[in-house]
From Swiss-Prot:
List of residues binding substrate: H125, R155, D156, R187, R193, R263, S264, D265, R266, K337
Protein name: 2,3-bisphosphoglycerate-independent phosphoglycerate mutase
Active-site residues, record numbering mapped to chain: S64
Cofactors (names): Mn(2+)
Record's function text: Catalyzes the interconversion of 2-phosphoglycerate and 3-phosphoglycerate.
Stored SUPFAM superfamilies: 2,3-Bisphosphoglycerate-independent phosphoglycerate mutase, substrate-binding domain (SSF64158), Alkaline phosphatase-like (SSF53649)
Keyword DNA-binding found: no
Gene Ontology molecular functions: manganese ion binding; phosphoglycerate mutase activity
Length: 517
């Protein structure tokens, strides 16, 4: 068998979905001569990236974490969201040892339970049903003080859609006869993942001490006040909820915190602020001595905290297969998506494999990426081209963050510019691979930029989509693309193209079949 071309590069265009709808489609509106040429000239197909095809509930939109887990594992990975939902259906959630032990500890000491989480129906980082269930568990186990510190979405949901979630949560408190909102703040602050510590500090101070820019008697009133200030859900400033006759809530020594986000990347920073004795992100004016800090899922191997639903780590992932064969691989992305091409692509493994190099390009320090839609794509591309020219690597895996991160802003024109930036970068990578004799696969992890307006809410669409994503095989080898694939089929197909037999744990479906010479 002949030696396959090298390197084989995989470019993951984050948030570049496929849709034949042209209205509000930033990808369609953009000038993309390189993309158009590649799509027309080379074998291509579309692959599924949401719902059950990636281990999520039916009709659940995909996301970057899930997408990269499926891509790197080469199989469908059933997500924490699905596992928690199953526990709710069977009732085992309410007997989960980690959760019940934490609640019982607070009850025995007559202390408070503080529940943190993204109060959202999106199911990307958290789901409000899980928060409702946790409140119910705590109250039914006779906890007298149950407080919810709610992060608001507006990014994976419509920008102004939190009222329904707040009203549903308040109805749950009323039904149970106990519990209340303690604070509201947008996810922009409480769920930062790019080491913008002043944002986390605002959320930490709100939760830990009750310190806030604003105060309201109810969560509904707090949201209305934020809208009057011109804020959308994602950007709601720190607001403490203090009903008439009540005192502001703060976390006291001996209290228990339970963090209900199941996705780890945006949960880590604020968790560090609560659990690390030597935390240096900002100066904590007050650090409560908690009885326990419990996370719904594992946020980091470094965290010595109880986990309600421990991770299930896949074996024989794509990176592991390459390492076992002594091959060299490069992972590269800017800050916003670096964890996705490393930790998530490796099936939840923090450490690089043998022969795996990593390059992190800092994301620009701007408030929102519509201010700089090109982000750091040019610098990422500079490093990819150098890596190709070095002749060191057998495989290069890169994530371009722009379509997703700029798409999340809801700014159509900025997202068009982001797409055009990526198109120019594709041209440079393609040219470098042609000179080196390598091959290229282009795909995405989920949709976003192909839908920029929500007709139902009559406002910008800032969330992911349910759409399939493109897949292109750029090679001079004769090949045909096959249909009915998903993200789980991408890396098994890459192994096939490299003359490597995929391990039995991986998908057997190929997205490309090489033709006989």
């Amino acid at each position: 068998m002949s030696t396959p071309p090298r390197p084989l590069a995989l470019l993951i265009l984050d948030g570049w979905g496929y849709s034949e709808e042209t209205a509000s489609n930033a990808i369609h509106a953009a000038h993309t001569p390189i993309w158009d040429t590649l799509w027309d000239r080379y074998p291509h197909t579309i692959i599924r990236a949401s719902g059950a095809e990636v281990g999520l509930p039916n009709e659940q939109m995909g996301n970057s974490e899930v997408g990269h887990l499926n891509l790197g594992s080469g199989r469908v990975i059933y997500q924490e969201y699905t596992r928690v939902n199953r526990a709710l259906r069977t009732g085992s959630f309410f007997t989960n040892h980690t959760l019940t032990e934490a609640v019982d500890r607070a009850v025995k000491s007559d202390k408070a339970i503080h529940i943190l989480g993204l109060l959202s129906p999106s199911g990307i980082h958290c789901h409000e049903d899980h928060i409702h269930a946790m409140v119910e568990l705590a109250i039914k186990r006779r906890c007298q003080e149950v407080y919810l510190h709610a992060f608001l979405d507006g990014r994976d949901t419509a920008p102004k859609s939190a009222q329904a979630s707040i009203l549903a949560m308040q109805a749950k408190f009323t039904e149970l006869g106990k519990g209340r909102f303690a604070s509201l703040i947008g996810r922009y602050y409480g769920m930062d993942r790019d080491h913008r510590w002043p944002r986390i500090q605002a959320a930490y101070n709100l939760i830990a001490t009750g310190q806030a820019e604003y105060e309201a008697e109810s969560a509904k009133q707090a949201l209305a006040m934020a809208y009057e200030r011109g804020e959308t859900d994602e950007f709601v400033q720190a607001t403490r909820i203090v009903p008439s006759g009540k005192a502001p809530v703060q976390v006291k020594d001996g209290d228990v915190i339970i963090f209900m986000n199941f996705r780890s990347d945006r949960a880590r920073q604020i968790t560090r602020a609560f659990i690390e004795p030597d935390f240096t992100g900002f100066e904590r004016l007050y650090w409560p001595k908690l009885a326990q800090f419990v996370s719904l899922t594992e946020y980091s191997k470094e965290f010595d905290i109880p986990v309600a639903f421990p991770s299930e780590k896949p074996q024989n992932t794509f990176g592991q297969v390459l390492a076992k064969l002594g091959l060299h691989q490069l992972r590269i992305a800017e800050t916003e998506k670096y964890a996705h091409v490393t930790f998530f692509f490796n099936g939840g493994r923090e450490q690089p494999f043998e022969g795996e190099d990593r390059i992190l390009i800092p994301s620009p320090q701007v408030d929102t990426y519509d201010q700089k839609p090109e982000m750091s794509a040019v610098e990422v591309t500079d490093n990819i081209v150098k890596a190709i020219e070095s002749d060191k690597y057998d495989v290069i895996i890169c994530n371009y963050a722009n379509p997703d991160m700029v798409g999340h802003t809801g700014d159509f024109n900025a997202t068009v510019k982001a797409i055009e930036t990526i198109d120019q970068c594709l041209g440079r990578v393609w040219a470098a691979l042609q000179s080196a004799g390598g091959e290229l696969i282009i795909t995405a992890d989920h949709g976003n930029a192909e839908k920029m307006y929500n007709a139902q809410y009559q406002q910008p669409h800032t969330a992911h989509t349910h759409n399939a994503v493109p897949f292109i095989f750029v090679s001079e080898r004769a090949a045909i693309a096959s249909a009915n694939g998903s993200l789980a089929d991408v890396t098994p197909t890459m192994l096939y193209l490299m003359n490597i037999k995929p391990p039995p744990e991986m998908s057997e479906h190929r997205l490309i079949e090489l033709s006989s010479p």
